[in-house]
């Protein structure tokens, strides 16, 4: 009779050990996700072609990480996710001007000037055309004050700093990092 109990005890121990490991992994992943990451669906085309979206169900799904900006400030040309305080939504845009800088756009040459000096774009952004709308019209410079001047990559239809002003550091939530859906678009989002 004791011979029959041995396989059951081994089986139960093996199962409990497996369950313990599985729960530890799920707990760790839950902690990491809620502590450091965010999943967001893109529902507009204001950041196309970098991020695409037509509706909540037909847009890129983005994994953003919240850890980087606890240790460093956003860099020029990076994407940031921030809280729009007027509409209480999460928004993703590209950083063009850093705190204390003046941003100007030459609409003809597509050159962005920072404090009067041309700001070269990364090669991956050469095809993006920014339009001198809102506070960038007439070739005038706009101060980012103590915030970040952001633009949407699809400049023709983007609610960005040209209309709403700079993004305050306290509004920044995360750094969009990876397109995780759809499979045909999986990849990193920053240059």
What label would you give each PLM region?
Residues 2-23, 31-191:
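Soluble "head" domains of membrane/secretory-pathway proteins
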């Amino acid at each position: 009779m004791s011979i029959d109990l041995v396989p059951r005890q081994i089986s139960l121990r093996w199962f409990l050990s497996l369950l313990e490991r599985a729960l530890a992994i799920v707990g760790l992943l839950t902690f990491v996700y809620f502590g450091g990451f965010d999943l967001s669906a893109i529902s507009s085309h204001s950041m196309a072609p970098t991020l695409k979206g037509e509706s909540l169900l037909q847009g890129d799904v983005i994994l953003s990480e919240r850890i980087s900006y606890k240790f460093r400030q956003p860099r020029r040309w990076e994407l940031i996710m921030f809280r729009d305080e007027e509409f209480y939504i999460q928004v993703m845009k590209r950083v063009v001007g850093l705190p204390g800088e003046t941003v100007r756009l030459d609409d003809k040459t597509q050159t962005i000037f920072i404090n009067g000096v041309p700001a070269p774009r990364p090669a991956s952004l050469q095809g993006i055309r920014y339009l001198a709308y809102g506070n960038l019209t007439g070739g005038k410079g706009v101060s980012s004050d103590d915030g970040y001047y952001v633009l949407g990559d699809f400049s023709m239809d983007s609610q960005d700093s040209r209309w709403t002003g700079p993004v305050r550091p306290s509004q920044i939530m995360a750094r969009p990092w990876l397109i995780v859906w759809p499979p045909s678009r999986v990849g990193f989002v920053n240059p």
